[in-house]
């Protein structure tokens, strides 16, 4: 058997199986003719108010199917596909005090890529003490033969996907959100999770904020995490709500070059960047002298499936 020179992983999310009682936000938005997440936000709010314990086996089944798909494809470090989350970012926020999911606020997101009505920050943000990540991780790890990576949204990305009606102080809001992520991460560490990823796609869109206070937020997220846990930050340039959308407004991949030095100094182990959809100048990799790079080699927003030779050529094996 040939020796594998690279460890493989995925970023996180998978399409939800149709038998789940919740829907992917982008499918719901597409039904309304765009990327408006308001309907799925309201529907999930209603769902959690009356959800049944009998649904649990469906989420376990979905996680097992998604994990096995990855393992069968040769993925070394799978995720649970985020199958329990109606929205990757808002799912975390539902376990925080200070958020209002009933009275939504209209905002324009992602540099104008889309607009919608969002959950609002109405009071000081604090973790409510109930760690969702431990239950979700243990459930997924119990049906996986490989170590499961757990993913969480980063503070800056949460800020750009919610409506601040209280702080009017972006660094302060970022710090408070980072504290909530840190509480989940430390709970994951205690539960035995060895691969923890914080997603900050907004770093690529808001370079000044990322440099000014976003890096500090990431440091706070991973504060107190021991060395035997792999700490990861993911920075993509944005993905559309459906495949083959060539007009979606992505972040400028030059942002990677602008942030590389600061990211390289963070107390993390790995940085995840996309390439298949933006084709970086690969001199970028030389700027990450202290970090392992998770290199996005699959064009996941395209219906065209690459040949194996194309992937090997891209990563120069």
List PLM regions with ranges.
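Domain-level signal for soluble alpha/beta catalytic cores
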Residues: 1-315
């Amino acid at each position: 058997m040939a020796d594998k020179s690279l460890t493989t992983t995925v970023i996180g999310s998978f399409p939800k199986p149709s038998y789940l009682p919740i829907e992917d936000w982008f499918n719901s938005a597409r039904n309304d003719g765009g990327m408006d997440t308001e309907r799925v936000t309201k529907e999930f709010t209603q769902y959690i108010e009356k959800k049944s314990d009998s649904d649990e086996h469906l989420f376990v089944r979905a996680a097992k199917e998604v994990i096995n798909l990855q393992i069968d494809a040769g993925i070394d470090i799978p995720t649970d596909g985020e199958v329990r989350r109606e929205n990757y970012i808002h799912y975390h926020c539902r376990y925080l005090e200070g958020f209002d999911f009933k009275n939504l606020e209209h905002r324009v997101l992602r540099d104008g890529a889309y607009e919608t009505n969002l959950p609002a920050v109405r009071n000081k943000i604090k973790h409510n003490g109930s760690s969702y990540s431990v239950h979700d991780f243990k459930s997924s790890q119990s049906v996986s033969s490989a170590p499961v990576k757990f993913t969480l949204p980063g503070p800056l990305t949460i800020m750009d996907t919610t409506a601040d009606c209280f702080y009017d102080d972006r660094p302060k809001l970022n710090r408070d959100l980072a504290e909530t992520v840190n509480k989940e991460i430390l709970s994951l560490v205690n539960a035995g999770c060895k691969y923890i990823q914080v997603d900050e796609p907004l770093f690529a869109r808001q370079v000044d904020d990322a440099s000014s206070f976003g890096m500090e937020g990431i440091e706070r997220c991973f504060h107190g995490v021991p060395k035997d846990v792999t700490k990861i930050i993911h920075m993509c340039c944005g993905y559309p709500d459906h495949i083959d959308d060539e007009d979606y407004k992505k972040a400028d991949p030059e942002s990677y070059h602008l942030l590389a030095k600061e990211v390289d100094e963070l107390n993390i182990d790995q940085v995840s960047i996309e390439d298949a959809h933006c084709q970086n100048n690969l001199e970028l990799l030389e700027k990450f002298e202290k970090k392992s790079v998770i290199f996005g080699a699959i064009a996941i927003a395209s219906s065209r499936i690459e040949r194996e030779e194309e992937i090997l050529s891209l990563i120069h094996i």
